[in-house]
Amino acid sequence: MKLTCVLIVAVLFLTACQLTTAASYARSERQHPDLGSSDQNSKLTKRCLGSGETCWLDSSCCSFSCTNNVCF
């Protein structure tokens, strides 16, 4: 009888620990969406413009040379 009670308490304790961990993991995923998949991160990565592409600033071109709104 004592052993059964100890086992039941242990199982309940471990279940509570898992539920707490799962809830905190899901909460941290919502708070830090930028730590998501690498596909999402690659979409957010700014790339430079190649030769012949339309530009507005020198810094947006890979060569840092924007003349008449075209990268050189």
Curated annotation (Swiss-Prot):
Q: Which domain of life is it from?
A: Eukaryota
Positions annotated as pro-peptide in this chain are: 23-45
Q: Please give the residue ranges the record annotates as the region Disordered.
A: 26-45
Extract the signal peptide range: 1-22
Q: Which Pfam families match?
A: Conotoxin
Residue stretches in coiled coil: none
Tissue pattern of expression reads: Expressed by the venom duct.
Q: Where in the cell is it found?
A: Secreted
- Asked whether the keyword Nuclease is assigned, the reply is no
> Which keywords annotate this record?
Cleavage on pair of basic residues, Disulfide bond, Knottin, Neurotoxin, Secreted, Signal, Toxin
**Molecular function (Gene Ontology), one example:** toxin activity
Q: Which cysteines are joined by disulfide bonds?
A: 48-62, 55-66, 61-71
The record's Gene Ontology cellular component field reads: extracellular region
Q: What is known of its domains?
A: The presence of a 'disulfide through disulfide knot' structurally defines this protein as a knottin.
As for family, the record states: Belongs to the conotoxin O1 superfamily.
Please identify the protein, giving its name as recorded.
Conotoxin VnMKLT2-0221
According to its UniProt entry, this protein's organism is: Conus ventricosus (Mediterranean cone)
